[in-house]
Amino acid sequence: MQNTAKKATLPATALAALGVVFGDIGTSPLYALKESFHAAHGLGIQPENVLGILSIIFWCLMLIISIKYVAIVMRADNNGEGGIMALLALNLRKAKIADNKKIYMIAIGFIGASLFFGDGIITPAISVLSAVEGLSIATDVFDPFIMPIAIAIIVTLFLVQKHGTAFVGKFFGPITLVWFLSLGILGIHSVIQTPVVLGMFSPHWAIQFIYHHPIMTFFVMGAVVLTVTGGEALYADMGHFGPVPIRLAWFFVVLPCLVLNYAGQGALLLRDPAAIENPFYLLVPQWALYPMIIMATMATVIASQAVISGVFSLARQAIQLGYLPRLSIKHTSESEEGQIYVPFLNWLLLIAIIILILIFKTSSNLASAYGLAVTLTMLCDTILVAVFIYSAWKWSLPKVLLLIIPFFILESVLVGATSLKILSGGWVPLLIGAIAVTILMTWKRGRELTFAKLEHDTLSLDLFVKSIGNSVHWVPGDAVFMTGTPNVVPHAMLHNIKHNKVLHQRNILVTVVIEDVPFVAPEERITTETLAEHFFRIKIFYGFKDEMNVPKALMQAYEQLGLEYDLMHISFFISRDRIVHSVGDGMSPWREKLFISMQRNTSPVSDFYQIPTNRVVELGSQIEI
């Protein structure tokens, strides 16, 4: 776990968590209840329907967020880290599953991660649009400008990503706290006028609604799920803040304020059914409308920022675990390691969000696209947590099923309900998810084939070291060969002998190994091995959230080997592999073409491992897969 939670006091850390963890779920009141009474449902705004839907919302928040995520899922941490990639890595390490069966668990993890990438596109679009749409409540004059204003805010948000959010991020927590308190105050003011709405806390209203409207309930659940969007963030951001501050913020600020606001909107509908046009903004007094629109816009920008940062972080984890090709990653803060910027993803997200806004035009239309991504991600989490509880906690299978099946059934119903909206927008997360899963699976399989080919076709390192003798000319200096296959001779070394007819006095084979843990302790970073007089093998171990700096790690390795370290006398030899198609078993031709394209466009190894470019010698090689 990072040190944020350790250094700051508990209330301060809980305040910081508000701005990062709860931005997404905190903006749901802008549109969730309105969508539950969408005209397409044909549901009348009678008191029993209002109380029934409010009761379903309350119990979904309690069951999915308070019990599933806060009480159960957040205990399934990978050395303090959460998130679907961390959970997948943990299960791959702990679960006693045959290798040929692990592919199913990897597929579930990849689906969940891919849908989160889709969430990174949909969340900024729907949240910013819903905030700006408040202007149309004030006056019709703004109607033609809703989309341009939303797009302008989104573009500005993405333009500042390269500068980082270290400074403005300090204000995210306080602003979000004011936002939640505003939600609560608005709700209380309305509930006092119509206290009968407090009946929503009784589950009998939810049961009665389901009994009288079984088919309608299925449609309504597709909108109710919008109230729990962002639940995964509680788990994903656990490594940064720690579980206790997140739980504290949820139970003492977020949950009460959300419930009060939904109750307040419901009370307004009981008094004035016509308020369904926009129950959130119509809850606001006329004098406070513009300040609330500004506050809502800030809250949605903060929520969007949290999701964007989450996408960047997830991408880095996937890259370091070997599930994505290397991308250029920039660090935007000298003090906070987790603050990163991925240029390629930044512009890809921006373009996708603008296209989404132009296609769907309103937050109401986008709601159809949103729910399916959320429910499928939650279902993936549930399955992976079940595996974790069974394998790591050693619970019996009946006990695991007794705990998990209620959540599995509820979330399966939510998936089914949101699936009804595939044609009206649900296709968006499915398309994004399918593309992302294809990329993840293709890259993983392609790398496996590449390494297998290298292991099979290349000379054994031990045999090479024993046979080299004095048959080559030795030149002064150190040659570091970066290799992913430490037991065979690197292509770069063979090409160096072939073209230059020399070897250096010290030849050091360096392999970077990514462990299934977020961070590796400094004392466990390095293993060294002396193979012969001129040959050494070094393995550098990193966690999937560690910052990788090979020259810095080499300094530690040299010290272990008793060698003098001088970066200016070290040449880094890197093989630039050119992958080509070959006849035989492997991947289908279209996947091979996709893999080859990704391989050609990866970020340079020297940039990724922070190796000075003036110390790099790159030699090309061809590999058939």
Swiss-Prot record:
Subcellular compartments: Cell inner membrane
Entry keywords, A to Z: Cell inner membrane, Cell membrane, Ion transport, Membrane, Potassium, Potassium transport, Symport, Transmembrane, Transmembrane helix, Transport
Transmembrane region(s): 13-33, 53-73, 103-123, 141-161, 172-192, 206-226, 250-270, 282-302, 340-360, 369-389, 400-420, 422-442
GO cellular component, one term: plasma membrane
Topology with respect to the bilayer: Multi-pass membrane protein
Chief subcellular location: membrane
GO terms, molecular function: potassium ion transmembrane transporter activity; symporter activity
Recorded catalytic activity of this chain's protein: K(+)(in) + H(+)(in) = K(+)(out) + H(+)(out)
Transferase is among the record's keywords: no
Function as written in the Swiss-Prot or TrEMBL entry: Transport of potassium into the cell. Likely operates as a K(+):H(+) symporter.
Family of the protein in this entry: Belongs to the HAK/KUP transporter (TC 2.A.72) family.
Protein name: Probable potassium transport system protein Kup
Species classification: Bacteria, Pseudomonadati, Pseudomonadota, Gammaproteobacteria, Moraxellales
